[in-house]
Structure formats: structure tokens, C-alpha cells
């Protein structure tokens, strides 16, 4: 009976009475429940000597308790890696590599938990590890926009004579943010600002500054268009891709570049995967160059917002990223 199972599992008598009342639709007469449980506890033998759980269930519960007590885990949806940190520590989340895996196993053994590497891997590959979306975690914890136009301020840091630069940058910036939150899954952010100016104008620094510190890991200025599969995977892995030294892209790669700029989703096979899958695109593009003669496509260059800079970009002033992106969300949701 239930009371006997609880007795052999080592559950105190009062807890058995209380849990029985809470979880089962038994007669409302508490005295009857209490006397029944009391009778079993007085006559049964072997309190706590035999659990009603199997050895596998006990091990799974023991492992789950150890992992949650010692560590925090999360599955990064962008990097497709499991990240960890020690619980009650000030450490940042770091990827779980072979050394970390071995350390977790050894720490468990030191506590008497007979875990092996394969058990830890099975745990980390399961839904016991919550999914973490870096973009959503940043954007959906922002304060309300205070009404100050910080997107315009950011655009005005780039000195140029083009009167259309500020509204074009605003449109591109809003499109970049919209694709991060999945507002438009049928079209890509197919236009790219192209900053043109001499060296030391801090073009690359400005591009990197567009992402807040919390999302800097999802910025890259190293993309090789000759490796097409890797380039397509970058659309899912990164939020902002800077085509630094745009003039170095060869004419033979221009057709693929045009294709990838307007690709709304990625249909490819992940590394070590066995099947092709549809991956969500997050990435927007921006580009820089020191040379003016860049866009030689005779069919037109509507995908690039070419800006000839008249001076260096001001990167000395800090950016209020929370208000910058709060403004973007406000405009996207209400305009």
C-alpha cells in the first residue's frame, strides 16, 4: 500500500499523512487517514531500508540534484553550445569543453556520485538544460524608451555630405533589430551600409560599437565567401557581419554575396549533423573600405548604402545601448 512504500522509502509518518491528503482524493476524515498510516508504521519493519524507486531512478535523481546544486547550465541557441558556470559564483558563462566535462565528473565522484562522462553528456544534451536566447534576453529586459532619438545621434557620428544617410541608417538599423526578434521571416535585411574613407577614420570600430557588450560575441569581421557553406552558417550564428575591406571581395564572389544578402533562411547541414535543416537567419551586414571605386555591378547596386566620409567617426562618447535598442523596439511595435 502507499503507506508501506513511504515507510520503506524512509519518509516520516507525518509527511506521509500530509502528502496523502494533498495529492489524493481520499475521504475528508483526517483521523481515518492518520490512523491507517499509523497502523502501517507501527507494524511494518525496515524503515528506510528499501526505496520504491529503481536503481536507475535513484541515480537520475542523485545526478540531477548534484548538477543543479553545483552548476548553472544553459543551451545557447546562437552558438548551439552548452554553457556553464559554478552556482553562487561571479563567473561568466563559458562553453563546456572536454576539460570542463572531466572536471564535473571528478567533482561528482569526490561527492560519492558514480557519474561518468557519458552520463554528464546525456544530461547536457537533454531538456534538463534550459534554452538561452541571447538576443531575446537582452531586448526583452530593456527599460521603456525615454523619447530621445538615439538612432539619429548614432548616425550623425558618421560625418558625410549625404543628406539621406540618417534616414537610410535608421531604416537599416530597425530592420536589423526586427530580424533579431523574428518580425519578418519572409525577407532578409538585404541592404548594407558601406562606409568609405581613409585609414584611421575608425570605421571598423564604429561597426563593432553597434552591438552592446552583452552581444559582442555575435559580431564578426572575418567571413570568407569562398567557403560558401560556412558563410551561410554565419547567417544563423552571428547578429552583425562586417565585410571589412570590402574591395578585397573578388568579382567571382560578388554573385554569391548578392545571393547571401537576400537569403531569408538558411537551408544547410550543421557541423556533425546528419541532415539538412532550416535555420533562422539573424545576421545583417555592414561594410567598410578605404577605396572609392567599389561597386562595379552594371545591373545596379541597390543593396549598398555607399557613404563617403568627410572625417573620422566619433567613437569617444559612450552609447546608451539600453535606450538605443528600447527606441528601436518602440518604433517597430508602434510605428
What function would you assign to each model-found segment?
Residues 126-236:
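P-loop NTPase catalytic core of nucleic-acid-dependent motor ATPases
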Residues 7-11, 24, 159, 177-185, ...:
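Hydrophobic/aromatic-lined pockets within catalytic cores
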Residues 111-133, 188-191, 217-220, 226-255, ...:
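Feature primarily recognizes SF3-like P-loop helicase cores of small DNA viruses
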Residues 4, 174-177, 207-211, 239-240, ...:
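Short, well-ordered alpha-helical packing segments
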Residues 46-153, 160-167:
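N-terminal nucleic-acid engagement/recognition segments and initiation subdomains in replication
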Residues 1-52:
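Modules that initiate DNA replication and primer synthesis
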Residues 1, 10-11, 130, 160-168, ...:
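Structural motif
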Residues 1-9, 18-19, 122-123, 137, ...:
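Short, hydrophobic/amphipathic alpha-helical patches that form generic packing surfaces
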Amino acid at each position: 500500500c502507499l503507506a508501506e512504500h513511504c515507510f520503506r522509502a524512509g519518509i516520516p509518518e507525518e509527511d506521509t499523512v500530509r502528502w496523502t491528503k494533498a495529492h489524493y482524493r481520499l475521504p475528508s476524515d483526517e483521523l481515518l487517514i492518520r490512523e491507517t498510516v499509523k497502523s502501517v508504521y507501527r507494524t511494518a519493519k525496515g524503515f528506510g531500508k528499501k526505496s520504491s524507486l529503481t536503481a536507475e531512478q535513484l541515480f537520475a535523481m542523485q545526478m540531477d540534484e548534484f548538477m543543479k546544486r553545483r552548476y548553472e547550465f544553459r543551451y545557447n541557441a546562437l552558438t548551439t553550445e552548452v554553457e556553464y558556470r559554478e552556482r553562487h559564483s561571479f563567473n561568466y558563462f563559458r562553453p563546456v569543453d572536454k576539460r570542463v566535462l572531466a572536471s564535473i565528473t571528478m567533482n561528482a565522484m569526490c561527492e560519492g556520485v558514480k557519474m561518468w562522462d557519458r552520463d554528464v553528456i546525456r544530461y547536457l544534451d537533454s531538456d534538463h538544460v534550459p534554452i538561452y536566447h541571447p538576443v531575446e534576453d537582452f531586448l526583452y529586459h530593456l527599460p521603456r524608451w525615454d523619447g530621445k532619438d538615439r538612432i539619429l545621434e548614432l548616425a550623425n557620428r558618421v560625418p558625410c555630405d549625404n543628406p539621406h544617410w540618417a534616414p537610410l541608417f535608421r531604416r537599416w538599423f530597425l530592420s536589423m533589430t526586427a530580424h533579431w526578434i523574428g518580425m519578418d521571416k519572409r525577407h532578409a535585411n538585404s541592404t548594407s551600409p558601406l562606409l568609405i574613407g581613409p585609414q584611421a577614420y575608425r570605421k571598423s570600430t564604429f561597426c563593432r560599437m553597434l552591438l552592446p557588450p552583452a552581444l559582442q560575441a555575435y559580431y564578426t569581421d572575418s567571413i570568407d565567401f569562398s567557403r560558401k557553406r560556412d558563410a551561410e552558417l554565419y547567417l544563423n550564428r552571428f547578429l552583425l557581419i562586417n565585410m571589412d575591406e570590402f574591395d578585397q571581395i573578388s568579382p567571382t564572389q560578388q554573385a554569391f554575396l548578392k545571393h547571401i544578402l537576400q537569403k531569408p533562411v538558411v537551408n544547410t547541414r550543421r557541423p556533425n549533423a546528419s541532415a539538412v535543416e532550416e535555420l533562422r537567419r539573424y545576421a545583417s551586414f555592414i561594410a567598410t573600405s578605404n577605396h572609392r571605386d567599389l561597386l562595379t555591378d552594371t545591373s545596379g547596386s541597390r543593396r549598398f548604402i555607399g557613404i563617403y566620409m568627410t572625417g573620422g567617426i566619433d567613437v569617444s562618447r559612450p552609447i546608451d545601448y539600453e535606450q538605443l535598442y528600447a527606441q528601436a523596439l518602440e518604433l517597430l511595435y508602434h510605428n
